[in-house]
Amino acid sequence: MSFLKQALMKELKIERDFEVYTTYKTGFDEFDYRNGFINPETKQQFTGLREGSYTMVIGPSGSGKTTFVLQTVVNMAKPFKGRTIIMHYDLEGATSPARIMTTTGVTEDWLTEHYIKKDNGVYAENFYNDIVAHAKLKKDNREDLLYESDLIDNGKPVMKYVPSFIILDSLALLMPEKNLDEEGTGSNISAAQAAKANSSIFKKLIPILGKCNINLIVVNHVNKAIQTSMYQPNQKQVNYMKQDESVPGGNTAIYLANNLIKLNAKAAFKDDDKYKLKGFPIECTIIKSRGNRAGQSFELLYTQEYGFNTPMSKFNMAKNAGVVEGTTYLTIPGYDKKFRNSEFIELYKDNKEFKLAFDNACKPLLESYLSGVGSGDQVKFAITDDEINDIINKDLPEEEKKSKK
């Protein structure tokens, strides 16, 4: 370390050269890797969403935004059973406990322990104040809310706040209370006033989120942009969006996001579709990423009843990339039996040998999506797959535990 660097760190009371971060898996493997990177020196892989970050998910009506966010947040929260919380500001009234249980697989008891929904009386001011109070509560109970991550800094494990999660659905409906008229209709609120309030709030929130490991995921809409000139097309609000697309709530809330994800529904599956799913594919585009290349698009498979089918989405990825070969009868490396499209889910769910072979076959493809150069932050998974499986299986009867080994 140079003399000047050492002196500055001492003078400015900087403890580390750079902060060390963990990441959390969303359960959407292709997204996690396309949003991740690998350190070319240490070969560490950094996938998923970074701790204490802010993500915005946008799309037109009916594109599965809320379901995507709920499945993502629950998947990130599950490893921290009994210690984390999901605070859901459902301004659109789009979610019910039954829908959450159906799409995420959690129980009513799990929701009771980890989930709070607020859908009335939410304004920009008290939304901000709630998050400030949330952060203060974590700071005041710091020792009870720390966990030992698998990050090592100067030979010692790094202690982290247990992650907590906030969902805002949606930014388009977040308005400042002080501008409401007496009747409460909000008729005198302009888009500019709302954008100004959001700008102030989000600028102040970002450091709070990072410091206390509060993970904010915001749902927003994609609207038709108003053409302002007869002679010149509109400038894109953000790269990789279309010129005729507009996202409400102000530009600051967009630019401050660590990740900006756009969902767009495609034509529904036909009854004779090869996957036998009742739903439709959804194009997921990473409009903005601070860990990987922006502009990447890929498909996720969505069903009306159960939300995003993550195993089938991974299977679709593998087929399109040639990892799975064949037409009627299919093969994968490491598994000597052929199978049909319609048999995949049951095999993946119930056949340990098949699941292992399929996941191993997909691994090189997923790793090829990682960016080769990261931000320089030291990042590593907060929890391993084996630890997740131990947590999931710990309450199973001994007979079931043995059968899963």
Task: Briefly describe each language-model feature range.
Residues M1-E15, A268-K405:
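C-terminal regions of RecA-like/P-loop NTPase motor modules
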Residues M1-W110, A124-A133:
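The Walker A/P-loop phosphate-binding site
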Residues T23, G27, R50-S53, K65-F68, ...:
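Helical mechanochemical/support elements of P-loop NTPase systems and associated helical scaffolds
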Residues R34-I38, P60, T72-F80, T102-T107, ...:
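Conserved, well-folded catalytic cores of nucleic-acid-processing
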Residues Y54-G59, E183-A192, S297-Q304, I345:
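Short hinge/gating elements
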Residues F80-I189:
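Conserved inter-motif catalytic segment of the P-loop NTP-binding fold
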Residues H88, I167-L168, I217-V219, K262, ...:
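A structural signal for short, well-ordered beta-strand segments and their strand-loop junctions
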Residues A191-A321:
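Phosphate-binding/switch region of NTP-binding enzymes
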